[in-house]
UniProtKB/Swiss-Prot annotation:
Cellular component GO terms, alphabetical: extracellular region
Main location as per UniProt: secreted
GO biological process: proteolysis
PANTHER family from the UniProt entry: BETA-SITE APP-CLEAVING ENZYME, ISOFORM A-RELATED
Matches recorded under SUPFAM superfamilies: Acid proteases
Name used for this protein in its record: Secreted aspartic protease LUC8
Family, similarity comment: Belongs to the peptidase A1 family.
Organism classification: Eukaryota, Fungi, Dikarya, Ascomycota, Pezizomycotina
Superkingdom of origin: Eukaryota
Subcellular location: Secreted
Signal sequence range: 1-20
Species per Swiss-Prot/TrEMBL record: Fusarium sp
Positions of the Peptidase A1 domain: 51-435
Group of enzyme by EC: hydrolase
Annotated InterPro entries: Aspartic_peptidase_A1, Pepsin-like_dom, PEPTIDASE_A1, Peptidase_aspartic_dom_sf
Length: 439
């Protein structure tokens, strides 16, 4: 997510994996056979921030590495603007940050859309963007006049850490009443008849090779899906729900936003080590009018979604089941340095467990919208520290949306949950689909 940039950059600069700077060659783009001919598949690689892939913007085209973000609202590019002026030396500093040069593009134009600013984000205070238009290409599928966000921070760029991407490819759903400032690039391309309405996604983390990801670690299909990776009969569709309370429960941006890929979380169980099943930890909470409100599950494929999601009560129950040991400060530092857990999972304890007993640990079971269960095996929520023989519980205890009695209003469905599933985001029906990956 975009609001996590600053915090993540401070922790990760200098320790990014090699894949962060190496994307498969653009020849890896390919069209996908399916119901819609207007689709293109792109490989993506993982780093400490999330999945990265390449697009081009402008005329002549400038190749930019994008951070995939299902929770952000638009296509954002780092620019040579700040303090309401164009001055790359002032606004980018000397870090070597890659960026989009609007003045090198003959097709770039400013818009009359208002400048927007978010006073409070984890990236930086007063995160400010202008809106322009330009040609955007995903592979060889291009869409002219795409509305995009252009950075215009109210301070020089020297103090902003360098990140290994030039912008954010937001893919949040466009719900009723949202204007062009909330329109992702692929949504605009669909509306213009350049792409289909769907985006397909899969990780190769649980697959035998990277071939289904075109040599990357994940694959995005803009305008369609890769039907060879799932059985359509097993695809379960969930219409999104974006109530007003979601903004504060998920991430309290100012001004608030509620347009996310969500569905009711109606069940959260832990199958105990002695075949004992826990109680249901997806507990309704009291709404503003006193009625019971069902928690929501939020899709988040980025760094903030790392780890299996649990409430505090569920986490404590799991720790008892696996006889977890409170991690030392040194181990916690190793966990953060490795980048295998969400960096906004603050205010939670970390626990180490025996690496030899993983197969005997319980499964985590999640029920979405009252009718489909999904299982996360222990191999996907127990993580080994790369430089030691230590294993730890990789649990996402999201710091927002917690209730005083240890329950949670939201659960982030990230890589631990999604790695064995095919994901379909549908901008036309405002729904998403999940199906088991064909292994």
């Amino acid at each position: 997510m975009m609001h996590a940039f600053h915090h993540l950059a401070v922790l990760l600069i200098g320790s990014l994996p090699a894949s962060a700077s190496t994307l498969p060659h653009p020849d890896g783009y390919r069209h996908v056979n399916g119901s819609c001919s207007k689709s293109v598949a792109v490989p993506a690689v993982w780093n400490g921030f999330g999945y990265l892939f390449n697009i081009t913007v402008g005329t002549p085209p400038q190749e930019l590495t994008m951070l995939s973000d299902w929770t952000w609202m638009s296509l954002f590019v780092r620019s040579g603007r700040c303090l309401n002026q164009y001055d790359p030396s002032l606004c980018l500093g000397t870090s070597g940050q890659t960026w989009f040069d609007e003045r090198a593009s003959t097709s770039f134009a400013n818009t009359s859309l208002p400048q927007l600013s978010w006073p409070l984000t984890a990236f930086a205070p007063n995160f400010t963007v202008d809106y322009g238009t330009d040609d955007v290409c995903i592979g060889d599928l291009c869409s002219a006049g795409t509305v995009l966000q252009v950075s215009d921070f109210p301070y020089p760029g020297e103090g902003i850490p360098k990140v290994p991407f030039s912008g954010i490819f937001g893919m949040a759903p466009v719900t009723a009443g949202l204007n062009e400032t909330f329109h992702p690039a692929n949504y605009q391309a669909w509306k213009a008849g350049r792409l289909g309405s769907r985006v397909g996604w899969n990780s190769c983390a649980a697959l035998a090779s990277s071939d289904p990801c075109l040599g990357g670690e994940a694959k995005l299909v803009f305008g369609g899906t890769d039907s060879s990776l799932y059985d359509d009969d097993t695809l379960r569709i969930y219409e999104i729900q974006n109530p007003d309370w979601l903004s504060d429960a998920f991430y309290p941006l100012t001004p608030p936003r509620e347009n996310y890929w969500t569905t009711p979380l109606t069940g959260s169980w832990i199958l105990g080590t002695s075949e004992e099943e826990s109680r249901n930890f997806a507990v309704p909470f009291s709404g503003s009018n006193g009625s019971n409100v069902t928690p929501l599950a939020v899709l988040d494929e980025g760094s903030e979604g790392l780890g299996a999601p649990l409430s505090l009560n569920a986490y404590n129950w799991l720790v008892d089941q696996v006889r977890g040991t409170l991690a030392s400060n040194d181990t916690i530092e190793e966990i953060h340095a490795q980048g295998s857990s969400g960096f906004n999972t603050a205010e939670q304890n970390w626990y180490t467990v025996s690496c030899d007993d993983i197969d005997s640990y319980p499964e985590l079971v999640y029920e979405l919208n009252g009718h489909t269960n999904y299982t996360v095996p222990p191999q996907d929520y127990v993580t080994k520290l790369s430089d030691s023989s230590t294993c730890y519980l990789n649990i996402n205890l999201w710091k927002y949306g917690r209730t005083e009695d240890g329950n949670a209003k939201v659960a982030l469905l990230g890589l631990a949950f999604l790695k064995r599933l095919y994901v379909v985001l549908d901008f036309e029906t405002q729904s998403f689909g999940l199906a088991p990956l064909s292994m």
